[in-house]
């Protein structure tokens, strides 16, 4: 087993917020393992990429087991997520199962895979990527249920694992200018302008904003921060309804 002491596992690290997190951790000197369905467009030199559909339990367990045998992983970022938007009348059991499989179940599997190494080291950092949708968002019933579930997972694991030197926190991004967001919300569109006007700092967030928060929570010096949800939202979640 390779025990560099700074090995981080991240899910969904090939694009968007996940890619920014990978690049930040590499810049900070981590060995980074990226689990994703698709490879990154420009793999980094010190990045290990494993192609896996995290909704596939058998395949993902096999990959995680092999990685845990090779690496002493002491940092985990559960970033992979899927969305199936729609009104509550159209939410199906299949939708719920599909979103839970990636957003919640795969996060639990990843924690289970890295815990032996973290407990052996008496040190670990786990960050779950949530969303402001956990506080409620129209047409996101299934998605918001899973992200709120990550909050419960975060708080429960913080209580269970704190005595082992393992911290568990969540980061909840607000509106972030990723490629997918820009495709759905053109920068000059009136709806996009309304979103920006609703953000106290009057700008969209960037993937790097989220990566900075994640890097802080993964830092050695963050050992007294656990069980918390940090919203990276430009203040949007502070004043929900303040203009009503």
Model-assigned labels for residue ranges:
Residues 116, 159-163, 223:
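Alpha-helical segment proximal to the catalytic Tyr-Lys
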Residues 87-88, 95-100, 191, 195:
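Substrate-binding pocket helix/loop in short-chain dehydrogenase/reductase
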Residues 226-244:
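Short C-terminal tail/terminal secondary-structure segment
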Residues 91, 132, 137-145, 156, ...:
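Active-site loop-to-helix junction immediately N-terminal to the catalytic Tyr of the SDR YXXXK motif
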Residues 79-84, 235:
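Conserved NAD(P)H cofactor-binding loop of Rossmann-fold oxidoreductase domains
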Residues 172-183, 232:
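Short, flexible catalytic-loop segment of classical short-chain dehydrogenase/reductase
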Residues 111, 146, 154:
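Active-site helix of classical SDR
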């Amino acid at each position: 087993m390779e025990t560099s002491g700074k090995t981080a596992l991240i899910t969904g690290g090939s694009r968007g917020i996940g890619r920014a997190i990978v690049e930040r951790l590499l810049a900070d000197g981590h060995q980074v393992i990226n689990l994703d369905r698709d490879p990154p467009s420009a793999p980094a030199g010190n990045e290990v990429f494993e192609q896996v559909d995290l909704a596939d339990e058998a395949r993902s367990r096999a990959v995680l087991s092999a990685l845990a045998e090779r690496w002493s992983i002491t940092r985990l970022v559960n970033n992979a997520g899927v969305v199936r938007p729609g009104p509550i009348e159209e939410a199906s059991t299949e939708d719920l199962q599909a979103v839970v499989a990636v957003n919640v179940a795969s996060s639990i599997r990843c924690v289970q895979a890295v815990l032996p190494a973290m407990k052996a080291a008496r040190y670990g950092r786990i960050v779950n990527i949530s969303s402001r949708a956990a506080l409620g968002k129209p047409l996101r019933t299934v998605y918001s249920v899973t992200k709120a579930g990550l909050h419960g997972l975060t708080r429960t694991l913080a209580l269970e694992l704190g005595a082992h030197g393992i911290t568990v926190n969540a980061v909840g991004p607000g509106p972030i200018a990723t490629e997918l967001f820009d495709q759905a919300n053109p920068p000059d569109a009136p709806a996009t302008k309304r979103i920006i006007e609703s953000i106290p700092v009057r700008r969209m967030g960037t993937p790097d904003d989220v990566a900075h928060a994640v890097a802080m929570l993964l830092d050695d010096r963050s050992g007294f921060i656990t069980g918390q949800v940090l919203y990276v939202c430009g203040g949007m979640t502070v004043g929900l309804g303040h203009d009503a």
